[in-house]
Amino acid sequence: MFQDISNFYKDKTILVTGGTGSIGKEIVKTLLKFNPKTIRVLDINETALFELEHELNSEKIRCFIGDVRDKDRLKRAIEEVDVVFHAAALKHVPLCEYNPFEAVKTNVIGTQNLIEVAMDEEVEKFITISTDKAVNPVNVMGATKLLAERLTISANLYKGKRKTAFSVVRFGNVLNSRGSILPLLKEQIKKGGPVTLTHPDMTRFIMSINEAVKLVLKACYLAKGGEIFILKMPSVRIKDLIEVVIEELAPKYGYKPEDIEIKIIGKRPGEKLYEELIIEEEIYNLEELEDMFVVYPYGVDGNKNNKIIYNSKDAKFLNKEKIKKILKEISYL
């Protein structure tokens, strides 16, 4: 299948929004290996675009300074594009709680803008990058990403005779991405602690950036329109993750692990104790593949399997040895 996926992207013109973020940047770097015609990277961060252009040093990269809120800019960016990966978003839960209007403008209106210009341009495939926080959301960020998902899936119903296939990829927590827990832990341990833990019972689904990008590129290749693709992911207790990181990193920075305090600070605004990958209603339209779940559009039956565990508190937790192994695989330890 790898060769089929590689061939799919060959000679394509591809647009990646949010292309300087952790996921977007890795999508761009991986796509370059498949010999596309052009990759257009749209981002609001001028400095990050400049750095990306110099890092990749490829004539296939075109950097577009722009915001998904600006529909006119999107019209220019999407001209003659074959495939869209929509990774631009406001993603930090507490910041979105305090800036809800801004979250709506980017995550909802921005997604609508991009869908509409993609439809008019009749791009071949359109993938929205979503999050497990969109499942039964309790915070602004999750609610806006739920709307982004629904807008994307619903676009298949109102596109008329246009050919674009709109689909969604739903992620768990991406390890060592910008703003995630791992970079924060490293900084706290460097300073001798304390290391902050919001709640001792908190659990999360985790995945590496490489796993995330593989899922996105495979999902886009498979997409027919209307599907939600979800990577199968392990779950961790955040407390276990923190203890492993302290045990491994404290000696590297001249501290004894037992001297690094773990300070309980309480849940942040909008934060859940556990995450969910799939809502109950989606199970009836769900198919389980080797490495992912696929939720099909309403009215399309998947394999009915009511035994699927779809929240991080009931999933089997990684033990500390396996956590350590994963952290070494992503070159964090």
Swiss-Prot record:
Q: Which InterPro entries match?
A: NAD(P)-bd_dom_sf, Polysac_CapD-like, Polysaccharide_Synthase-Rel
A Pfam family that the UniProt record links to this protein: Polysacc_synt_2
| Signal peptide feature range | none
The family assignment reads:
Belongs to the polysaccharide synthase family.
Name this polypeptide is given: Uncharacterized membrane protein MJ1061
Q: From which source organism is this entry?
A: Methanocaldococcus jannaschii (strain ATCC 43067 / DSM 2661 / JAL-1 / JCM 10045 / NBRC 100440)
